[in-house]
Amino acid sequence: VTPVSSAVAAIDQRVYFVEKPEKKKLLVSLLREEDKSVLVFSRTKHGADNISRLLSKSGIRSEAIHGNKSQNHRQRVLTDFKSGKIRVMVATDIAARGIDIRELEIVINYDLPDVPETYVHRIGRTGRAGHSGTALTFCTPDERPLMKDIQRLTGKKLNAETYRA
């Protein structure tokens, strides 16, 4: 068993094939169904801010962390997220490095990472220390080659759902 496949074995992984304009609706819909803390990954700083604004306007308490935010801001957001003061933390990959959140049940890949190994690091934020976890990934038509690379790396075919608003 490779370290990659063992790391992802305890995580329920699902992919949503979705058109780019529908991603926002899908995210809000999924977050309204769940009452748990969720870490959402965005590929860009700008995207993280946009997602956080969208969620806040939709009545879902969220904050974004990324490299343009101060260390104090990132620390406050992390503290608020861990305490449940905010339910959704939107992060870029670099900002999320080294973050340890116990019992995080759900990770959402709003954007697929450019590098398959980054996917493994992202979903590894959930399902830690014997807990189960869920990783939901949004995949637009232009991201399908990235999804194939991820499945090749993990050796796992993800449960797929097609989202239509």
Predicted regions and their residues:
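Conserved helicase RecA-like core
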Residues: 1-165
